[in-house]
A protein has these predicted regions:
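Core catalytic region of metal-dependent phosphoesterases/phosphodiesterases
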Residues: 1-53, 172-176
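Active-site neighborhood of phospho(di)ester-bond hydrolases with catalytic His/Asp-centered motifs
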Residues: 1-6, 42-45, 106-110, 135, ...
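A structural motif corresponding to the C-terminal end of an alpha-helix
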Residues: 31-43, 51-52, 97-101, 142-156
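Binuclear metal-dependent phosphoesterase catalytic core
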Residues: 50-53, 146-153, 162-224
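Binuclear metal-dependent hydrolase catalytic cores centered on His/Asp/Glu-rich metal-binding motifs
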Residues: 52-104, 136
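Active-site-proximal beta-strand elements of phosphoester/diester hydrolases
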Residues: 56-71, 106-110, 181-189, 216-220
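A short secondary-structure junction signal
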Residues: 69-75, 117-123, 169
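Active-site-proximal segments of metal-dependent phosphoesterases and phosphodiesterases across multiple
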Residues: 103-153
Length: 224
């Protein structure tokens, strides 16, 4: 699944090329062909059922292309593609998804939820303008609260967008557990970087087993 962000194209073929621009045209064509056959899927306002360790979870892909803050990003495109004309309509779409979800839920989003702090160094706090405040998505925060009100367990919220290193040089937390929900900000920039002995790619790994759920940061070498 690919959750497109605010800097991504809206077309899967272009996004596949964007993700693989350093790998050559053959790689790009292969990714594009796989996307057409279903192995790569753009997600957003979509419900994906996952079975792991004998339990069923609902992976709910929230609003794509979000830039955070109090307004709906790319309103014309969101209306044309998803039928979403406002944050209130987005909220209602997420509510319907929660109603159809299993008892255990993982939210996947581009930007994280509002409510986790309004300082520049907070998980989704605004660091690019004075007094920016909380830059999380209010519709996502509402959906999380609604899921809890329906006695559903929000196991994790996985997002990014707000770079872990702020413009002030502060490091945001990449993981927080609040009210039994694990919040993950995976926006390490650059995600692909040169190390002393290799080129590394930053990932966040989620493991689910009979004892519960764990997260870890993984640096995968390109050549080693």
């Amino acid at each position: 699944l690919v959750m497109p962000g605010n800097n991504d194209t809206f077309e899967i073929d272009q996004l596949a090329a964007e993700l693989n621009h350093q790998q050559g045209v053959n790689k790009i064509l292969a990714i594009t062909q796989r996307s057409e056959s279903g192995s790569i899927k753009l997600c957003g306002y979509s419900h994906h059922r996952v079975s792991a360790a004998g339990r069923e979870l609902s992976l709910l892909a929230a609003r794509p292309h979000s830039m955070g803050g109090p307004t709906l990003t790319f309103p014309e495109y969101m209306a044309e593609t998803y039928g979403i004309n406002s944050l209130e309509e987005s909220q209602q779409r997420l509510r319907n998804m929660v109603d159809e979800a299993s008892q255990d839920i993982i939210f996947l989003a581009h930007n994280g939820p509002a409510g986790l702090g309004d300082s520049p160094g907070d998980m989704w706090g605004c660091d690019f303008k004075p007094g920016g405040g909380d830059w999380g998505d209010t519709d996502l925060a509402w959906a999380i609260g609604y899921a809890r009100s329906r006695q559903k367990r929000v196991r994790a919220v996985i997002a990014g967008h707000m770079h872990l290193k702020t413009k002030q040089g502060e490091q945001r937390p990449w993981q927080q557990v609040i009210d039994d929900t694990c919040y993950i900000n995976a926006a390490r920039v650059p995600r692909i970087f040169n190390g002393d002995d290799d080129v590394y790619r930053h990932h966040v790994m989620l493991r689910i087993d009979a004892t519960g759920m764990t997260f870890s940061e993984e640096l995968l070498p390109q050549y080693g």
